[in-house]
């Protein structure tokens, strides 16, 4: 599940990962037409990966909630909180959380404090998480430093430990570009490996 403010690339990342998994070219025209999520959206990506000497065929199901906060007001009534109240009973397991922010908008990074509180109850003790920065292709506009990213990762880890003292999942940070495709193959592999590892920790 990718979470974060609106317009940080949650839907875009999942759409492009599907193309990467099928070795298709990134379609910039399609990307330009992606609109914000107003409900819980679903994307599926299947990838084949080798870990050690074992071949895995992993299907990833992405649940993409809105990035609108209830406190900010939403005329459609489809804030993150409202959508989660509807769908939370049907969400049985989250193997990976993508805390997503825009490298060029530092406020989206700082707002991850809000999102970790929002998904804490959805996690289990084996849920992995990735601190995911988007818009890596716009490096000249980056507002989030490497030191801030490292500090943010540690902050999220501590917050999750406070929420779930028996948490055994792994965490990392990664920065990607949906325009150039940079690091998306790495992200796809990490997601697949995280699902496998999460299921090994807690079948």
Regions found by a protein language model. Name each.
Residues 1-202:
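TRAFAC-class small GTPase G-domain
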């Amino acid at each position: 599940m990718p979470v974060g403010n609106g317009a940080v690339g949650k839907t875009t990342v999942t759409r492009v990962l599907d193309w990467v998994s099928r070795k298709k070219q990134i379609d910039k025209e399609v990307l330009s037409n992606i609109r914000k999520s107003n409900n819980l959206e679903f994307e599926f990506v299947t990838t084949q990966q080798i870990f050690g000497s074992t071949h895995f065929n992993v299907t990833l199901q992405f649940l993409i909630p809105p990035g609108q906060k209830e406190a900010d007001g939403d005329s459609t009534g489809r804030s993150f909180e409202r959508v989660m109240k509807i769908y939370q009973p049907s969400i049985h397991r989250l193997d990976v959380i993508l805390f997503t922010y825009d490298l060029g908008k530092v406020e989206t990074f700082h707002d991850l404090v809000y999102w970790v509180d929002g998904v804490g109850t959805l996690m289990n003790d084996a849920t992995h998480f990735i601190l995911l920065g988007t818009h890596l292709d716009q490096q000249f506009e980056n507002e989030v430093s490497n030191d801030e990213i490292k500090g943010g990762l540690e902050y999220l880890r501590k917050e999750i430990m406070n929420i779930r003292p028996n948490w055994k999942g792994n965490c990392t940070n990664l920065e990607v570009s949906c325009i150039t495709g940079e690091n998306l193959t790495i992200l796809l592999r990490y997601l697949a490996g995280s699902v496998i590892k999460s299921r090994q920790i807690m079948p």
